[in-house]
């Protein structure tokens, strides 16, 4: 069987200018920091990033924004990273703010191959602008379309050599659903174990949806 293991250097071969990339994490917790650093050092530009938030200037996906590598961000929160706001106001970067529940459901729909979903969230607000609305049973709903990416960068706690993943506490956040919603998914595990060492009922993400496992000195 072909191995899924690869180095960070190998992973940079997937990075291209203009890509749409989903990145796991919540204020940097559960973000694949070594993959983000490799993405920054690769020099790629004009990225569209889909993430829960833009974290801080030196945390999570923040350094990608600070260094001008991002053309567009789709996220639910940017308030802790002043550079995101500055670039949005100046017109240097496009920012699409999405309610958090809507964002994760868009990602889930992208992973499940669905055409979208109906939600009342945002009706009558700026969120509604440019979107199709439907009236069902006397209630107005927004049609939210699915989100997918060229590449997903996720982090897991433990990973076996087939790519089966477990997560730790709040570091789980968006990672399991992001893993499903991209053409290629790269995982950065805290710990790499042999196949068979993970308890089946502890596995959250099956190895079938993981394309490559990033190994480094930090992966025990």
UniProtKB/Swiss-Prot annotation:
Residues reported to bind CoA: 24-30
Protein induction: Transcriptionally regulated by the regulatory protein AtoC.
Localisation per UniProt entry: Cytoplasm
Superkingdom per UniProt: Bacteria
Enzyme class at the top of the EC tree: transferase
Pathway membership: Lipid metabolism; short-chain fatty acid metabolism
Keywords: Cytoplasm, Fatty acid metabolism, Lipid metabolism, Transferase
Principal cellular location given in the protein's record: cytoplasm
Residue runs in coiled coils: none
GO molecular function: acetate CoA-transferase activity; butyrate-acetoacetate CoA-transferase activity; CoA-transferase activity
Disruption phenotype: Mutant lacks acetoacetyl-CoA transferase activity.
One GO term of the biological process aspect: short-chain fatty acid metabolic process
Keyword Phosphoprotein found: no
Subunit details: Heterotetramer composed of two alpha subunits (AtoD) and two beta subunits (AtoA).
Stated role: Coenzyme A transferase which is involved in short-chain fatty acid degradation and catalyzes the activation of short-chain fatty acids to their respective CoA thiolesters. During acetoacetate degradation, catalyzes the transfer of CoA from acetyl-CoA to acetoacetate by a mechanism involving a covalent enzyme-CoA compound as a reaction intermediate. Utilizes a variety of short chain acyl-CoA and carboxylic acid substrates but exhibits maximal activity with normal and 3-keto substrates.
Family (UniProt): Belongs to the 3-oxoacid CoA-transferase subunit A family.
Protein name, entry field: Acetate CoA-transferase subunit alpha
Organism: Escherichia coli (strain K12)
């Amino acid at each position: 069987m072909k191995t899924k293991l690869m180095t960070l250097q190998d992973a940079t071969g997937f990075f291209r200018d203009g890509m749409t990339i989903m990145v796991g994490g919540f204020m940097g917790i559960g973000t694949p920091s070594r993959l983000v650093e490799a993405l920054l050092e690769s020099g790629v530009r004009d990225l569209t990033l889909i993430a829960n938030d833009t974290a801080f200037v030196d945390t999570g996906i923040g350094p990608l924004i600070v260094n001008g590598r991002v053309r567009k961000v789709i996220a639910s929160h940017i308030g802790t990273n002043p550079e995101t706001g500055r670039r949005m106001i100046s017109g240097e970067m496009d920012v699409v703010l999405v309610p958090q529940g809507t964002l994760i459901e868009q990602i889930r729909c992208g992973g499940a191959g669905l055409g979208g979903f109906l939600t009342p969230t945002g009706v009558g607000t700026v969120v509604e602008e440019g979107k199709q609305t439907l009236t069902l049973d006397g209630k107005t709903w927004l049609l939210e379309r699915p989100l997918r990416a060229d590449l997903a960068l996720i982090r897991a706690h433990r990973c076996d050599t087939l790519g089966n993943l477990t997560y730790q506490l709040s570091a789980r956040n968006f990672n399991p659903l992001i893993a499903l919603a991209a053409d290629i998914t790269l995982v950065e595990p805290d710990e790499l174990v042999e196949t068979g060492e993970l308890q089946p009922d502890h596995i959250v993400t099956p190895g079938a949806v993981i394309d490559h496992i990033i190994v480094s000195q930090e992966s025990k």
